[in-house]
Amino acid sequence: MRNFVLLCIMMFLQFFIWGAWYVTAPNFLTTIGFDANDIGWTYAAGPIAGIIAPLFVGMVADRFMAAQKVLGFMHLLGGGLMYYATMQMENGATPDAINIVFFVYMVTYFPTLALSNTVAMKNMNDSEKDFPKIRVFGTLGWIAAAFALTLLDYETNINMFYMTCVAALSLGVISFILPNTPANSDSEATLRQLLGLDALALLKDKAYMIFMVSSILICIPLAFYYQIASRVVEMAELPIAVTMSYGQWSEVIFMLCIPFFFARLGVKKMLAVGMGVWALRYALFAIGAPNQTSVLIVLGVLVHGICYDFFFVTGQIYTDKKAPEPIRAQAQGLLVMLTLGVGMFIGAKVAGYIEGYCTPETFAVLERTVEMSDEDYAKASKLHELRQIDWGRLWGIPAVFAGAVLVFFFVAFKEDPTNESEQASDTGGDNPDADPYQTASQALEPVVAEGEACSVDGDCDTGGG
């Protein structure tokens, strides 16, 4: 019970840290001279860090140091870096200088997304059954951050970054009392292991390769949501952080339902539903944003639970089952690197470009000359932005792209029909009285043993790939 409570606290703070600034940052940064291109680089800094750091940090946790200690060091360092970034903002540093500090901070933060998963999964007996119960506290942490931002009136000012510092330092300290998650140090590390390349062997499995390619591609439109959606909410005159937190409330509900849906849908359908709802959400924004139709905007936020849980949480569990035990931290790091790293980097730059393309040049010039100390002028400029930006095109592009990714995945990700029907039978798909938490663990069988990787079809290679 003690371990469960500690792991829940870890997940709560892990996502409180992220939620405390990541969605609402543009609402403040635009007041200190950041334009659309600068914001694009702010959101590209994390993905670049995600490309560089997670595999290496995962390798350290796999081979040299207990994962919870690595997690603690990274958050303590990250808290200090976020404080330094905040000081840079206070002192009027340029957007480029601030973005450099953001980049270094994200080098410390992004690997902790995979490390927290590793610490949790290595201290549970059944990841399909137990992981959602712990991971849901991450969502609650994000929600708590959103409510704190609104209640403390931090949504559009620098205090959001101070709150992030405190949360990061707190988790850094708490990490050292988390359940011990020792490194696998039975053998001498090879150069391949030092470079964190062992996890790349997972890509030899065709089904996993298709999953990973689809994950990278779906993270391109994902960047639009994190980067732009909060400003649509603000311009619809809705409370920013609280409205954005509706997505996390739906995430809580669907997180707890994951074992139930695993038992009835299986991996492929779970992932496909997640991608399909991404396309639906952007279609809702494309229709609702131009006329400030609050119902459609809020509905687009509310479906976040399906978008995130059915694709990303399913993918984390799928990766945990595919990877041999000695490289599971690296495997989670690979997933973070290629999705929140490569995919989100491309998405951040594309979103910045598309936003600029859909913003008339006359407004772009006005935006750069706004003196945000004049509150009335600032609000007027926001309303002007809503009227002038081509929101239908801006959100229509990621909607079509997400739909195309769904088609690619559904066609390319092959399951053996015989195995699929057997799985439905075994998991109680036709038995409404079956225990979903018990049968969910069967939905991803067979579990990968060390040195063996199995495709979703049930075919196995015994060469580590």
Predicted features by range, described:
Residues 1, 178-213:
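Juxtamembrane intracellular "pre-TM" segments in multi-pass secondary transporters
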Residues 85-89, 168-180, 341, 391, ...:
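Multi-pass alpha-helical transporter architecture, strongest
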Residues 35-45, 129-139, 159-162, 234-252, ...:
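Loop-to-transmembrane helix entry
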Residues 12, 81, 93-115, 119, ...:
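Hydrophobic core of transmembrane alpha-helices in multi-pass small-molecule transporters
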Residues 1-50, 207-243, 312, 348:
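Helix-loop boundary and gating motifs at the non-cytosolic
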Residues 151-167, 353-402:
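A membrane-interface helix-boundary motif in multi-pass transporters
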Residues 52-66, 152-153, 254-267, 355:
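Helix-to-loop junctions at the C-terminal end of transmembrane segments
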